[in-house]
């Protein structure tokens, strides 16, 4: 056979394997997606404004002035907001987990416990649903991302921030965020970021970072990888952490005839989607546009599987000093009674009940003593009256004797 004949052989038609991504796209587009994000941080850091700006719609209403004047909550609450968003015929079920009351008290000891319990409960609930015979419709509220809002003090992280992030980072994808970054100058912001990164590294707090291996880094530098732009984008996101954000839901004219979402000050505008002003666009890319599936898959393959493995192996809580992962030995249904904050309230209620019982017992003893004293007084009065009656009877007898003598 000649070389010309060999090269002229017909190329077989494709079998259709390359069409698999299109099939997958169709399935995902029909099923839609679910994304659950937890907002953690002190009150007044713009969490509600940020989430509304992120999805460009009003998912949560801001607390009114009347609500802000209510007494400070003694415990951390869990507030769940659900919404169905649609963009280009694709539906995304969004669950926003807010944590009002976190960090608002003078004593914030164990303030992170309700957050940790909630994340563990969702893992446990999903695991129990997987063990059921019929699993066609599973309710999934597992947290895919935790946005931890840091107050822009310019100094560093507070102990409650460090402890809470350490606890959350072993259970969910933790993303630290510097709130209200426009209150710091550019130099102060960079120094603040550097301090936070140093503390995160020293405390071995695991934060979510875009996947970036060593080979990808080299390819990005040389430009040999066709995905080098994506790798470079991931590197920029990593360098920008913790993200400095500014929140606003109002639009203003930027002086060029364009309406932009911004915060207006006497000296000018702080544009939300301007990379030179804040990191909002980078955080949005991490959460939605570029790495949403990575957040979901990491939750499933790492955090949930870790919880499931430890639960099935019967591991118990290894103590406060374990920095890897601590799994409560008790069932989630009984966690409430073992929560340290509820323990404090339980002890306070027991003390109050004991004090009330003692007060009532003291009151009854005093009442009994008063009755005894009254009985003694009445007996004395009765004896006195009986004595008077006896004397009167003797006098009557004496008079009767005298009367008989006179007759």
UniProtKB/Swiss-Prot annotation:
Modified residues (N-acetylserine): 2
Keywords: Acetylation, Cell cycle, Cell division, Coiled coil, GTP-binding, Membrane, Nucleotide-binding
Species this chain originates from: Saccharomyces cerevisiae (strain ATCC 204508 / S288c) (Baker's yeast)
Residues forming coiled coils: 344-406
Keyword Chaperone: no
Miscellaneous note of the record: Present with 1170 molecules/cell in log phase SD medium.
Residue ranges constituting the Septin-type G domain according to the UniProt record: 31-314
Encoding gene (name): CDC12
Protein name, entry field: Cell division control protein 12
Membrane topology: Peripheral membrane protein
Subunit description: Component of the septin complex which consists of CDC3, CDC10, CDC11, CDC12 and probably SHS1 and rearranges to a cortical collar of highly ordered filaments at the mother-bud-neck. A complex formed by CDC3, CDC10, CDC11 and CDC12 is capable of forming long filaments in vitro and the components seem to be present in a 2:2:2:2 arrangement in vivo. The filaments are proposed to be formed by the end-to-end polymerization of CDC3-CDC12-CDC11 complexes with CDC10 serving as a bridge to bundle the polymers into paired filaments.
One GO CC term on file: Gin4 complex
Region feature (G1 motif): 41-48
